């Protein structure tokens, strides 16, 4: 089987390149070889490569930066997924695409289910929602996987930022009123591998929209505290953490206060096993990846 994986150097893609070994011929493309802001380039490459499965792990993920470059964010996060869906449908190839908890406004007092009405707060969330809708409008075989608070040992993310700041500073303020599930990119890749294997062996669940995040919930402050605990276990000095409200840390893009996602549907329909956020953090920190 020929698999096309987009987003070569991204957090999820890097983990997928490990998890999908043995699943077939894996063709990986980054922005240098397939620019998702160029529609004709997308069409040309897919028609030349003719993959049997397309996994789109590429995205414009700079949430604050998106506020000042909406056109680029929509080109990559909205227009490109629609084109990928069209080309995938023409090839008869399923499309797996990753979306975000930021399609919601965070006002619900419980975890969000797939059929809750989206209401994004910023450009990034609006562009991701538009990408979902573009894929759904095509109507081909697809999985849209909304995830949350992605981190890994690569790239730019909360885990790596906290590890650095906790050792550089004496005191550190961290937002405590945003709650969600930090999700290791390795866990997303492992869940994706489970989905691919079930599809390949004829045990696929229904195509469509699903939530995929770590189990459990924690605030950014709680997540930072868990990271600090692991650093101290290694004998490293860490900053004193202070909880603050979101209002004390203004950013160009507003964040939802509730980013919790209900993953029951994915577990029920596809029998995917998901780790809790704290176990996944420990696995990530001790991973040879």
Spans of model-derived segments:
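N-terminal Rossmann NAD(P)H-binding glycine-rich loop of SDR-like oxidoreductase domains
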Residues: 3-19
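SDR active-site strand-loop-helix element
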Residues: 6, 29, 57-58, 95-100, ...
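Adenosine-cofactor binding site in Rossmann-like domains, unifying the SAM/SAH pocket
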Residues: 21-44
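NAD(P)H-binding glycine-rich loop region in Rossmannoid oxidoreductase-like domains
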Residues: 39-76
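Catalytic helix-loop patch of NAD(P)-dependent Rossmann-fold dehydrogenases
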Residues: 68, 75, 80-83, 90, ...
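NAD(P)-dependent short-chain dehydrogenase/reductase
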Residues: 133-181, 186-194
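Mid/C-terminal beta-alpha module of Rossmann-like enzyme folds, strongest
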Residues: 191-192, 198-252
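Amphipathic terminal alpha-helices
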Residues: 275-289
């Amino acid at each position: 089987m020929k698999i096309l994986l987009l987003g070569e150097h991204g957090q999820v893609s890097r983990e997928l390149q490990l998890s999908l070994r043995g699943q077939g011929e894996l063709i990986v493309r980054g922005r240098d070889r397939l620019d998702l802001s160029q529609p004709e380039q997308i069409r040309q490459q897919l028609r030349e490569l003719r993959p049997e499965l397309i996994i789109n792990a590429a995205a414009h993920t700079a949430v604050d930066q998106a506020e000042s470059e909406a056109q680029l964010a929509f080109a990559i996060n909205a227009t490109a997924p629609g084109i990928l869906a069209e080309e995938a449908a023409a090839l008869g190839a399923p499309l797996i695409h990753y979306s975000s908890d930021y399609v919601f406004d965070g006002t619900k007092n419980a975890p969000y289910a797939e059929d809750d009405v989206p209401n994004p707060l910023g450009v990034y969330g609006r562009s991701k929602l538009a990408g979902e809708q573009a894929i759904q409008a095509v109507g081909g075989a697809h999985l849209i996987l909304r995830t949350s608070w992605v981190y890994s040992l690569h790239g730019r993310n909360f885990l790596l930022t906290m590890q650095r700041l906790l050792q550089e500073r004496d005191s550190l303020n961290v937002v405590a009123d945003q709650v969600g599930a930090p999700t290791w990119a390795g866990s997303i890749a492992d869940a994706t591998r489970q989905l691919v294997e079930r599809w390949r062996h004829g045990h696929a669940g229904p195509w469509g929209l699903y939530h995929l995040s770590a189990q459990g919930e924690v605030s950014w402050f709680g997540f930072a505290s868990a990271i600090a605990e692991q650093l101290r276990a290694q004998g490293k000095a860490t900053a004193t953490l202070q909880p603050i409200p979101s209002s004390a840390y203004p950013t160009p893009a507003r964040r939802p206060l509730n980013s919790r996602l209900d993953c029951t549907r994915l577990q029920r329909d596809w029998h995917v096993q998901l780790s809790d956020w704290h176990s996944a953090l420990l696995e990530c920190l001790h991973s040879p990846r």
